[in-house]
Amino acid sequence: MVLSAADKTNVKAAWSKVGGNAGDFGAEALERMFLGFPTTKTYFPHFDLSHGSAQVKAHGKKVGDALTLAVGHLDDLPGALSNLSDLHAHKLRVDPVNFKLLSHCLLSTLAVHLPNDFTPAVHASLDKFLSTVSTVLTSKYR
C-alpha cells in the first residue's frame, strides 16, 4: 500500500502529537492486544503480562521507538525496518496476523488519547501507515 503525500502529512502530524508518549501508547496497545486477543500472549511466555508491568512497558517502548523510526523514514520503510523484519521473521517467528491485531489496538489507543486529532482522514492515514509497516515486517517471511 502506497502512502500518498496527504497520508504522510497526516501520519507525521499525528505522530508529532504522540511525542514522548510513544512508549506508553505502545505499552497500552500491547495490553489491549493481550486482553482482546489472548492468543497473542503465547509469544511472551516469560513476561509478566499484568497491567503496568515493567516488561510490557519495556516492550511498549520498543514498539513506540520502532514506529517513531518508521515515521521518520516514510519514504524507505523497508530499509528502516529491515532489522526488525529479520528479527520477527527468522528469530521470533511471530505469526503475521499479530501485526494486524497490534495495529488495531494501536489505532484504538491513539483514538482514545488524541480524540480531537483523530479525524476520519487521520484515522485512514494511520491505518494505511500501520498496514504498510505490517507488510514490511512480514516481507521476509517469504
From Swiss-Prot:
Tell me if Acetylation is a UniProt keyword of this record.
yes
N6-succinyllysine PTM sites in chain numbering: 8, 12, 17, 41
Record-level Gene Ontology MF annotations: haptoglobin binding; heme binding; iron ion binding; organic acid binding; oxygen binding; oxygen carrier activity; peroxidase activity
The Globin domain, residue ranges:
2-142
Question: What's the domain of life for this entry?
Answer: Eukaryota
Phosphoserine is found on 4, 50, 103, 125, 139
Q: Which residues bind heme b?
A: 88
Modification N6-acetyllysine occurs at: 17
Complex formation: Heterotetramer of two alpha chains and two beta chains.
What does this gene product do?
Involved in oxygen transport from the lung to the various peripheral tissues.
Protein name listed in UniProt: Hemoglobin subunit alpha-1/2
